Amino acid sequence: MLEGQIIKALSGFYYVFSEGKVYQCRARGNFRKRNISPLVGDDVEFQIENKTDGYILDVMSRENALVRPPVANIDIAILVFSAVEPDFSTNLADRFLVAIEKEDIKPVICISKMDLASESEKEQIAVYKDIYEAIGYDVFVTNDEPDKEAIKDYISGKTAVIAGQSGVGKSTLLNSLNSDLTLKTAEISNSLGRGKHTTRHVELMPIGDGFVADTPGFSSIEWDDLQPETLQFCFPEIEDRRSGCKYRGCMHENEPSCAVKTAVEANEIAEFRYKHYIQILQELKNRKPRY
């Protein structure tokens, strides 16, 4: 019995990467009865029938799982936003951060297209960078030509996703990383049957000793399962101060003696971050129940 990680799922086959090789596997027949649906990123136990084919025997417990894209065991999410074209939006950045924080995935903020920004825009980005770094987030900026080495350092030994709205440079980032992999991944690409005209599915690409989920469509934000009372845990600087609130169930909205509001007034929490917290809180409270 071998252990490996699913790096692609297509037409009922699961492509499992183990010790430098890729095996085309099917799931055991009883998976459906046990309500087990393997995902790309799953760690699995499998047995091989020959040099290239095998059967998945069991799926290990997951650290986390995203719905769209359907991928499991993500260690890190590189959230790509452009400085300009489209302009950097703290509102959008905070919404992506909430979506990633709620899955207990480490976010890294990448701000692209800095070479296209004016001096005043660069100064404003620098202010935002300082604020997010003070919260505890890693932030790096890139020009039109991405800093591949910096990105590889983040990905090393991990499974990562790259997310962001359309037009911010996700494809440029992936393609620049992928260009270095032609020789290294030739064998894997052949095993997976990757071609120019194949339908795009979620797929883990090896980058150094890590993997990146090739998810071109990852630009939506999902928080259907997020409850109003748990939103505060997706804002680290709010979570850090909640213990100082007078009332145990404080939502940091209209309650008296709120340590979070006091921190906002003292400029210890960025006003825009608190504003976005309240906006999202109201959206969650006003959300219609789904049946």
From Swiss-Prot:
Q: Where are the transmembrane segments?
A: none
Q: Which GO terms describe its cellular component?
A: cytoplasm
Report the co-factor binding details: Binds 1 zinc ion per subunit.
Residues at which GTP binds: 112-115, 164-172
- Residue ranges of domain CP-type G in the record: 63-221
* Top class in the EC scheme: hydrolase
Residues the record lists as binding Zn(2+): 245, 250, 252, 258
Q: Which domain of life is it from?
A: Bacteria
| InterPro entries named among the record's database cross-references | G_CP_dom (IPR030378), NA-bd_OB-fold (IPR012340), P-loop_NTPase (IPR027417), Ribosome_biogen_GTPase_RsgA (IPR004881), RsgA_GTPase_dom (IPR010914), RsgA_N (IPR031944)
Names of required cofactors? Zn(2+)
Q: Does the keyword Zinc apply?
A: yes
Task: Recall the GO molecular function terms of this protein's record.
Answer: GTP binding; GTPase activity; metal ion binding; rRNA binding
UniProt keyword terms in alphabetical order? Cytoplasm, GTP-binding, Hydrolase, Metal-binding, Nucleotide-binding, Ribosome biogenesis, RNA-binding, rRNA-binding, Zinc
Biological process, per Gene Ontology = ribosomal small subunit biogenesis
Q: Could you tell me which SUPFAM superfamilies the record lists for this protein?
A: Nucleic acid-binding proteins, P-loop containing nucleoside triphosphate hydrolases
Enzyme Commission (EC) number = 3.6.1.-
Q: Where in the cell is it found?
A: Cytoplasm
- HAMAP family in the cross-refs: GTPase_RsgA (MF_01820)
Quaternary structure, from the entry = Monomer. Associates with 30S ribosomal subunit, binds 16S rRNA.
Record's family?
Answer: Belongs to the TRAFAC class YlqF/YawG GTPase family. RsgA subfamily.
Q: NCBIfam families this protein is in?
A: ribosome small subunit-dependent GTPase A
- Known role: One of several proteins that assist in the late maturation steps of the functional core of the 30S ribosomal subunit. Helps release RbfA from mature subunits. May play a role in the assembly of ribosomal proteins into the subunit. Circularly permuted GTPase that catalyzes slow GTP hydrolysis, GTPase activity is stimulated by the 30S ribosomal subunit.
- The molecule here is called Small ribosomal subunit biogenesis GTPase RsgA 2
